[in-house]
Amino acid sequence: MKNSLVGGLDDRQVKYLGPVHEGKKHDKRLCDEEGTRFPAGAALYRDSAYQGHEVPGVTVHQPRKKPRGGELPAEDKATNRLISSVRVVIEHLIAGVKRCRVVKDVFRNTKEGFDDLAMELACGLHNYRTFWRHQDY
């Protein structure tokens, strides 16, 4: 199971969940086919799997790769650390969704739309957990 997921950095909740695709599809191709739109002026932190995917009106932050046979400048290393510190929040969000084993294990159900429903339930449970985690009792 694979789909695109947009999460909020402030509340660590799933904001957008794309339709489920087969797991073998590349991340960039998945985003190109979906045509996900973002609000103007949004910041997008992504990994190198989305290299070449352009989103109009969005500030894209992507880590720099070390040049072949060379070294990465100290400024780029510092930028990569900053991007990684933001992206780790989203990686933890994805791990929170994958606590539901139906999402991360081999999915053998062939009923139409059941894979989307399972992913929606997993994201809903994650949002429920994070909502109560950040509330004052």
Locate predicted features:
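Short, well-ordered secondary-structure "scaffold" segments embedded in the functional core
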Residues: M1-Y137
